[in-house]
Amino acid sequence: MPQNDYIERHIKQHGKRLDHEERKRKREARESHKISERAQKLTGWKGKQFAKKRYAEKVSMRKKIKAHEQSKVKGSSKPLDTDGDALPTYLLDREQNNTAKAISSSIKQKRLEKADKFSVPLPKVRGISEEEMFKVIKTGKSRSKSWKRMITKHTFVGEGFTRRPVKMERIIRPSALRQKKANVTHPELGVTVFLPILAVKKNPQSPMYTQLGVLTKGTIIEVNVSELGMVTAGGKVVWGKYAQVTNEPDRDGCVNAVLLV
């Protein structure tokens, strides 16, 4: 019997639209405008119900904000004395470090260390327009249909990649522009090794380009570093490590990257 999970099953079998994340972001951005429009246009009983609902949402939000602000330790904390004895005058302005404050500062410090650990060589890159990224392919008997696109940049596809049927393939990734290996430079050792690419983790241009595996300047890729003999603190061999593309692959014809260590 069906268990009302047909939507999840369809997503598992066929995946999501290529522009799903972009559509979701735009839908969320439009939500505030829709709420404002409804608040202005609804009248009568519907308007009262809508206003009541919005009021309840705002009250709960204020409570959350207040609770969050109270969780932040501000002002003077407990005095230094723990035995109940009175403090001398010159010690009254001193404060004892609160546990919550210490935990908060340690979390902030860890975040800073993590950000420093994963700092990339190229923090900013030039934006690429869709006209530069995609080439319109005319199809049909009279070449009147223009719903197909061909990627003009270098891409990476996995080992088990299979093209969709030609009549259903909307975005074409040419075989001549597919890359499987990259020239990866180790910044500390100063050596460059030709390593196989495992995956494209993040393209700074768009989430859709990440899903398509487009390789542009600033893209974070995962490479197989087992040949370098790198090991963890526990003695295990490191298999994959992140690297950032530092060149324009479509101009140079190859992928150059710097290992993130």
Curated annotation (Swiss-Prot):
Component of the pre-66S ribosomal particle. Interacts with NOP7 and RRP1. Interacts with RSA4 (via WD repeats). Residues 1-43, 61-87 are annotated as: Disordered. A motif (Nuclear localization signal 1) lies at residues 15-22. Keywords: Nucleus, Ribosome biogenesis, rRNA processing. GO terms for cellular component: nucleolus; nucleus; preribosome, large subunit precursor. A motif (Nuclear localization signal 2) lies at residues 51-58. Belongs to the eukaryotic ribosomal protein eS8 family. Ribosome biogenesis protein NSA2 subfamily. Its main location: nucleus. It comes from the Eukaryota. It comes from Saccharomyces cerevisiae (strain ATCC 204508 / S288c) (Baker's yeast). Involved in the biogenesis of the 60S ribosomal subunit. May play a part in the quality control of pre-60S particles. Under normal, rapid growth conditions, high levels of NSA2 would allow the progression of pre-60S particles through the ITS2 processing. This is Ribosome biogenesis protein NSA2.
